C-alpha cells in the first residue's frame, strides 16, 4: 500500500514538464520557481509550524539555494525546452550520477549489479538522446544535467544533517528560503527584462491559474509533504519503486496534453531506461526477502 502511495508524489512531479508547457509556456522560469516554492513552503509551515535553531540557518540557506532555487529554475527550463517524456525519463538517470559521485568523492565503489545497470542505462540514454534520431534543445539538456547535479549535491548535504534537524523543518524552510531567493532574483530580472513578466501578469488566464495551482498545491505542497511523511514509514528502496510513476507520468502527460509522440524504438529505449533504473532495487529486495524467509525457516 505504501508503494502505491509513493507513486502519488512521483506522478505529480512527472507531470511538471507537460503541465508547464501546456499552461505556462511563456512564463519566466525564475517567476515560476518563486511561485512554486514560496507559497508551498508557507502552506507547509502553517500546517506544522517549526523554527530552526540559530546554528541551522546557514545550512538551510545553502539547501534552499541548491535544492529549491537552482533546482526549480532548471526544472522549469527543462519543461519549457524539452519534450515532457524526455525530461521525465532523463531524470531517472540520477542514481547513475549519484553512483559516480560517491565513487569519485568517497572512494566507495559500486556493486557489480549497480555498475552493470548504470552502464546499460547510460548506453540506452545515449541511443535515446542521439541527435541523429531526435532533435533536442542543448539548453534543456544542460539544464537536465544541472538539475541532476542539484539532486546529488543537495541530497548529500541533507544527509549530512543527520538527526540534527527535523525533516519537516528542513522541507518547509528550504522551500521558504529558496522561494525568497527566487523572488528576489525574479524582481531583479523583471527590472532588466520587464516585457515577459508584464505579459504574464497582463495576460493571466484561467489556464495559467489552473497550471499554477497544480504546480503549487499538488506538485509541491502535497507532493513534498507526502514524500516526507512516507519516508518515515517506508524504506528508501521501497520508495524508489514508487518512483516509476515519474517517467510514466512524463510520457503520458506529454502525450495527452502536448500530443507528443515517438517511434516504437524510442519508446522501447524509455522503457529500458526505467527498467535499468529499477533493476538494482528489485534484485536487492528479492535477496532481502529470500534471506528473511531462510532465516525464518531456520528459526
Language-model segments: which ranges?
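Juxtamembrane helix-entry segments on the extracytoplasmic side of multipass membrane proteins
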Residues: 1-3, 25-30, 34, 53-58, ...
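Hydrophobic/small/kink-forming positions within alpha-helical transmembrane segments
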Residues: 11-14, 18, 38, 45, ...
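Specific transmembrane alpha-helical segments of multi-pass solute transporters/efflux pumps
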Residues: 12, 16-17, 45-91, 125-127, ...
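Transmembrane alpha-helical segments that form core, pore/gating elements
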Residues: 18, 40-44, 98-99, 136-194, ...
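Hydrophobic/aromatic residues within transmembrane alpha-helices
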Residues: 23, 32, 36, 77-78, ...
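Specific alpha-helical transmembrane segments that line the substrate/conduction pathway
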Residues: 31-42, 76-109, 113-115, 147, ...
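Helix-helix packing/entry segments at the starts of transmembrane helices
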Residues: 33-35, 72, 87-93, 157-180, ...
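Hydrophobic transmembrane alpha-helices of multi-pass small-molecule transport proteins
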Residues: 44, 110-130, 244, 253, ...
Amino acid at each position: 500500500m505504501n508503494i502505491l502511495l509513493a507513486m502519488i508524489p512521483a506522478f505529480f512531479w512527472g507531470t511538471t514538464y507537460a503541465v508547464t508547457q501546456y499552461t505556462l509556456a511563456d512564463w519566466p522560469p525564475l517567476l515560476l520557481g518563486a511561485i512554486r516554492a514560496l507559497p508551498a513552503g508557507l502552506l507547509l509551515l502553517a500546517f506544522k509550524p517549526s523554527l530552526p535553531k540559530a546554528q541551522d540557518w546557514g545550512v538551510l540557506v545553502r539547501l534552499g539555494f541548491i535544492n529549491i532555487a537552482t533546482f526549480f529554475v532548471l526544472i522549469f527550463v527543462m519543461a519549457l525546452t524539452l519534450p515532457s517524456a524526455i525530461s521525465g525519463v532523463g531524470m531517472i538517470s540520477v542514481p547513475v550520477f549519484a553512483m559516480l559521485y560517491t565513487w569519485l568523492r568517497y572512494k566507495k565503489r559500486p556493486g557489480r549489479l549497480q555498475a552493470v545497470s548504470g552502464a546499460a542505462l547510460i548506453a540506452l540514454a545515449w541511443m535515446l538522446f542521439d541527435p541523429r534520431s531526435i532533435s533536442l534543445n542543448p539548453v534543456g539538456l544542460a539544464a537536465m544535467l544541472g538539475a541532476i547535479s542539484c539532486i546529488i549535491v543537495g541530497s548529500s548535504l541533507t544527509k549530512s544533517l543527520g538527526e540534527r534537524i527535523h525533516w519537516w523543518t528542513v522541507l518547509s524552510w528550504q522551500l521558504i528560503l529558496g522561494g525568497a531567493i527566487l523572488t528576489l532574483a525574479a524582481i531583479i530580472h523583471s527590472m532588466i527584462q520587464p516585457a515577459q513578466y508584464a505579459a504574464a501578469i497582463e495576460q493571466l488566464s484561467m489556464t495559467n491559474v489552473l497550471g499554477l495551482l497544480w504546480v503549487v498545491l499538488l506538485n509541491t505542497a502535497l507532493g513534498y509533504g507526502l514524500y516526507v511523511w512516507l519516508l518515515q514509514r517506508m524504506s528508501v528502496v521501497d520508495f524508489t519503486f514508487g518512483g516509476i510513476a515519474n517517467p510514466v507520468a512524463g510520457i503520458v502527460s506529454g502525450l495527452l496534453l502536448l500530443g507528443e509522440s515517438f517511434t516504437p524504438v524510442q519508446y522501447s529505449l524509455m522503457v529500458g531506461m526505467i527498467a535499468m533504473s529499477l533493476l538494482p532495487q528489485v534484485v536487492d529486495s528479492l535477496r532481502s526477502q529470500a534471506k528473511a524467509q531462510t532465516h525464518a525457516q531456520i528459526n
